């Protein structure tokens, strides 16, 4: 079982540790205060990544490139991706077409950092599950090998990886 939790402005998660301890996968994402100053946003993200319950950093920029759009949050990607590497947190490759998150330049940087990835459709309705193929195409174009994509692994290996960070 898994959950997507909100990263609060102070870097805490919006769910209690006793709940998170019962889950196999925890995706941490920012859903509010997306316009924080760069240094504060970087600190917020790193604090969340240091939480041993966090397995995946979701839609890291929060941007939307279609419709009314939304600019990406500003953060120091080198510092955030270094934290992902240090704490073995995968980076979500969000397949929602209006997100395209992370953008290509951050995806390239994450590959350079040797990060693991989780491809996620971000589906909110059954017909949106087909977006997964878009994420797979982006991963292939970015040169991400299947072994760096955590959700291509057998379930037992995925759960073992997610449980490898001591709480």
Question: Where is each model-derived feature located?
Answer:
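Phosphate-binding active sites in nucleotide-utilizing proteins
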Residues: 1-2
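Active-site beta-strand->loop->alpha-helix modules in alpha/beta enzyme cores, enriched
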Residues: 6
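Charged catalytic cores and adjacent phosphate/nucleic-acid-binding surfaces used
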Residues: 9-167
